[in-house]
Design a protein with these regions (language model features):
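N-terminal Rossmann NAD(P)H-binding glycine-rich loop of SDR-like oxidoreductase domains
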Residues: 1-22
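Adenosine-cofactor binding site in Rossmann-like domains, unifying the SAM/SAH pocket
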Residues: 22-48
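Catalytic helix-loop patch of NAD(P)-dependent Rossmann-fold dehydrogenases
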Residues: 72-90, 94, 98-99, 107-127
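Active-site loop signature of alpha/beta-hydrolase-fold enzymes
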Residues: 12, 37, 42, 63-69, ...
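Short acidic/polar active-site loop segments enriched in Thr and Asp
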Residues: 27, 55, 98
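NAD(P)H-binding glycine-rich loop region in Rossmannoid oxidoreductase-like domains
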Residues: 43-82, 94
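Short, well-ordered alpha-helices that flank and scaffold nucleotide-derived cofactor binding pockets
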Residues: 15, 19-23, 50, 62, ...
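SDR active-site strand-loop-helix element
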Residues: 7, 32, 57-63, 100-106
Length: 127
């Protein structure tokens, strides 16, 4: 049985992922809340890796709000989400995690991005 850590496991996507994984092959799911670990801080992330000992990490956690709050504090949202990813990826490397999956948000793409979006497409309209 593999030990999995799902960051953001108690959010919308995380709850659905937990339900899917629970119906599949046996895995041990760990989904601690953000109050336990500040994923923007290297010390907290290291402490989490040591305590949870995950073999697989699914990174779904993000600082989110709504369109209004995102527009009021774009740098804060960008910074905190970036730091979570950086700290978790480095922690995974340092703790020899077998598999790391990070999920992004549509908020990271330009305002007028065609759907479906292709990484080869570029836009000068970045919000």
């Amino acid at each position: 049985m593999r030990n999995w850590w799902i960051t953001g496991g108690n959010g919308f996507l995380g709850r659905h992922l937990q339900a899917q994984l629970a119906s599949g092959p046996a895995v041990s799911l760990q989904c601690p809340r953000s109050a336990e670990y500040d994923l923007t801080q290297a010390a907290d992330v290291s402490r989490a890796y040591q305590a949870l000992q995950p073999e697989v990490v699914i990174h779904l956690a993000a600082k989110v709000g709504g369109i209004g709050i995102n527009r009021e504090h774009p740098a804060e949202f960008f910074y905190e989400n970036l730091m979570m990813g950086v700290q978790l990826i480095e922690g995974a490397r340092m703790h020899s995690v077998h598999k790391f999956v990070a999920v992004g948000t549509i908020c990271a793409y330009p305002k007028f991005t065609p759907v479906p979006f292709s990484p080869s497409e570029r836009s000068s309209s970045i919000t």
